Amino acid sequence: MTAEIISVGTELLLGNILNTNAQYLSRELAALGITVQRESTIGDNHGRLADFVNEAKQRCDLLVFTGGLGPTADDLTKETVAGCYGDTLAFDPEEWQKIVDFFTRTGRKTTPNNRKQAMVPVHGHKVINNHGTAPGAWFEQDGHCAVLMPGVPHEMKAMWTESVRPLLLARQNCTLHSITLRVLGGESDIEYRVRHLLENTNPTAAIYCKTGECEIRITARAETDSSAEKMCRAYATKFYDLLGDAVYDEDVTGLEETLVHTLKEKGLTIATAESCTGGMIAQRLTNVSGASEVFGFGFVTYWEQAKAKMVGVEPAVIAKYNVVSAPVAAQMALGAAEAAGADIAVSVTGLAGPNGGDAVRPVGTVYLGAACGETVYVKKLFVSRPDRALVRARAAQTALELALRLAQGKVPADTQALAKSARHDAATLTALDSTFLKG
C-alpha cells in the first residue's frame, strides 16, 4: 500500500506552527509497511485543496489528512474531501451532544458554528475523537481511501492509536510487531555498523537520530502475533551482536527512563550538580514517573559562589584551574553526592555560548563528573557546533549516560578516575587537569 500525508492549514505554510504531525505519521505508516510517497502542506483554500486531492488519488492508495476539521470558516477539509470522494455530510446529533457536553464541562458556551464539527460522512464513516471536539472521517471510492484526523497533535496521535491504526491493520490481513532499540552514539557511525541489516524487507529496520543517541525500529509482518514477535526478536539479536552494550534498552522513551529503572532495581539513589545545563538533567529525571524513589536532590550551581556554598567546590580550585575544568567537575560531583547522601552524583560545568571561551576552552567545552563510592570519573565533551541549545542537550545526555554506566556497575568509557581521598590534593588535581588539556 502507498500513501501520501497531507497537512492542511495556512498557518503551517506561514511557518507559525511546526508540523510534527507529518513526522509522526511517516514513522507510523512505515511501521505498518505502508510506503509514504509524498508529504504535502496545503493552505485553507477549497479549490486548491480539491485539485490536489483529485491529483493525489491517482498517485497512491491512501491519503492521510491532518487539520481543517474545526468550527471556523476556513476549516474546509471534511467537506472538500467528501466532495472528491463522491460523498456528502450530514448532521450527527450524537456528535453534537458530545460537543455541547464538552463545552459545558469546561464552563463555556457552545456557539452555533460548532455544529460544523458534528457533520459526518453519509457513505463513509466518522472516526471517534475521545480527546477533543472534532471527529475524524474515513472515505472510500473505488478501492481508494482517505482518512481525516485533527491537526492538534495530541488529538491526532490518540485517534491514530485508538482508531486509524487498527483500521489499517485490519485491511492488511496480517499482524505487526515492533521493537525499538535505544542505542548510544551518532547516527553515521551506527548506520555504518548495521548498514546491511537496514536493507531487509521483512522484518524492516529504520534508524532515527536523536541528541546523543539513535532509535532503531524493527518491524515484522506475519499471520499471527507470535510469529511476528519471534521474527522481530530474532532480527533484534543481530543488532545486539553488532552494537553490543551501545544498545542500552528497548521500547523506552529515553535514557532517563532506563536510568531511573536501573537505580530502582539496584536500590541506588542519584543527585545532580549542574551549571551550564541549568537543571536539564534533573528535569529529565523527574519526567519519569516514580523518579522520587531514587532522586531527591538537584543542585543548580550557576555562580561560582553557588558551587562553593552548595557542593563544596574550593574557590582556590576555581581560581587555579578555571570554573570550566576537570577538577571543578570532580569536586562538584563528589560534593553533590555528600550533600545529598546519594550513591551516585553527576555534575556538569561548561561553556554553552555563544559568548565566552578562548583558545584553551572554546565555546562547546564541557566537563562532567560522575561520582560513585570512593571514586569520581571525569569526562571532557566538546560540541563543535556553537549552538547553545545543542551544547546543553548533549551535556545532559552525556551526564545521564555516565550515571547509567555507574548504576550498571561499569566504568564509564573515555573517563579519567580520581580517588575521593585525593580531591583536595594539588598535585593530583593538576595532573587531572593536564591530562584533559593535553587531549
Locate each region found by the language model.
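Glycine-rich oxoanion-binding loops at beta->alpha junctions
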Residues: 26, 30-55, 91-132, 306-344
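Accessory alpha-helical/coil subdomains and C-terminal extensions
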Residues: 140-212, 217-219, 227-232
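Glycine-rich beta-strand-to-loop/alpha-helix junction loops that act as flexible
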Residues: 8-10, 65-73, 150, 221, ...
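Proline/glycine-rich low-complexity loops and linkers
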Residues: 48-51, 75-171
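Glycine-rich phosphate/diphosphate-binding loop of Rossmann-like nucleotide-binding domains
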Residues: 1-39, 226-230
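Conserved hydrophobic helix-helix packing surfaces used for dimerization/oligomerization
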Residues: 3-5, 146, 270
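Short alpha-helical segments enriched in small residues
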Residues: 227-439
